């Protein structure tokens, strides 16, 4: 393989760039820096929201970041976002809310709101998520399921446009 043709390296954080303890090793940082010195752009693509990637940008300056499963891109100090339309998010969350004990999290530009407490993450717990959708731009809706059969039940009841 001719490495001189490589223009960019795009990596995930969790399970790829980071160790199991969520650290970035000195060796990895040195390797990324050597690639950059060869004119290669270093970027990350992650499901994490921007606020959860920022600690790693203090260890290494990434040329671009694709975060929140692609809902937000940060490149050269500029941000581009693809929000879920309010009506779509409202319809989706209302349909999900009809299922008792379904755990829902909304990711916005700056926060996460959930209808249940999540110990590992900083979230604002709020029973009714509709007012959040009305006032905030929603980047991502996460549905946390304990059982796979619940997913198939919920999917059958959702409009096809929401799959």
What would you call each of these model-derived segments?
Residues 21-120:
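Active-site phosphate-binding/coordination module
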Residues 5-22, 44:
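Asp-based phosphoryl-transfer active-site loop
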Residues 3-6, 39, 99-101, 136-138:
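A general structural motif
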Residues 18, 54, 155:
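A short local structural element in Rossmann-fold oxidoreductases
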Residues 12, 68, 144:
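Conserved residues at the C-terminal ends of beta-strands
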Residues 91, 95, 102-163:
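Conserved acidic, metal-coordinating active-site core of Asp-based
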């Amino acid at each position: 393989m001719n490495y001189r043709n490589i223009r960019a390296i795009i990596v995930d954080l969790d399970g790829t760039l980071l160790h199991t303890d969520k650290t970035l090793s000195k060796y990895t940082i040195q390797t990324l820096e050597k690639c950059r010195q060869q004119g290669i752009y270093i970027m990350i693509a992650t499901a994490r929201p921007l606020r959860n990637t920022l600690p790693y940008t203090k260890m290494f300056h990434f040329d671009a970041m694709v975060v929140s499963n692609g809902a937000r891109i940060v490149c050269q100090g500029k941000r581009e976002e693809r929000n879920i339309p309010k009506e779509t998010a409202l319809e989706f969350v209302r349909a999900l809310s009809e299922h008792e004990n379904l755990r829902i999290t909304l990711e916005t530009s700056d926060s996460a709101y959930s209808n249940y407490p999540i110990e590992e993450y900083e979230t604002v717990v709020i029973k009714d998520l509709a007012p959040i959708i009305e006032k905030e731009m929603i980047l991502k809706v996460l549905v946390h399921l304990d059982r796979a059969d619940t997913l198939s039940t919920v999917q059958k009841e959702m409009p096809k446009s929401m799959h």
